[in-house]
Amino acid sequence: MLKEFQKFIMRGNVLDLAVGVIIGSAFTGLVTSLTKNLINPILSMFAGKADLSGLYFTILGAKFTYGNFINDVLNFLIIAFVVFLLVKGINRILPSKPAKPAGPTQEELLTEIRDLLKQDQQV
């Protein structure tokens, strides 16, 4: 059982996934730092606040920190854009798979069925 587990872990897909998760978490930290330390100060110049994460409004005593949401949206958009660029670049580098040959059309299938039915009637 231990050998099966080792064989499973050493397969390419599992290792690729593990590397992807590790790099992804490191990249998320990098993007968070980019948003917090570079993008937020630029946006705060326009918002008039030193820190966007401190933006909030209160309704009936409930505090809604929409500044944190803005930071999270910026992080998501940056990560999504980078992933888009990576996928686009990889698709350009890797050869595309040839298209599967098209099967017979409906008319060809119906003609074949008709011919088979005629043969059955003649026998």
Swiss-Prot record:
One protein family per Pfam: MscL
Keyword Cell membrane belongs to the record: yes
Location within or outside the cell: Cell membrane
One GO CC term on file: plasma membrane
Keyword Transmembrane helix set for record: yes
Gene Ontology molecular function, alphabetical: mechanosensitive monoatomic ion channel activity
Domain of life of the native organism: Bacteria
UniProt keywords, alphabetically: Cell membrane, Ion channel, Ion transport, Membrane, Transmembrane, Transmembrane helix, Transport
Bilayer disposition of the protein: Multi-pass membrane protein
Chief location category: membrane
Entry-linked HAMAP family: MscL (MF_00115)
Assembly and oligomerization: Homopentamer.
Chain's role: Channel that opens in response to stretch forces in the membrane lipid bilayer. May participate in the regulation of osmotic pressure changes within the cell.
Similarity remark: Belongs to the MscL family.
Protein name (record): Large-conductance mechanosensitive channel
Organism whose genome encodes this protein: Lacticaseibacillus paracasei (strain ATCC 334 / BCRC 17002 / CCUG 31169 / CIP 107868 / KCTC 3260 / NRRL B-441)
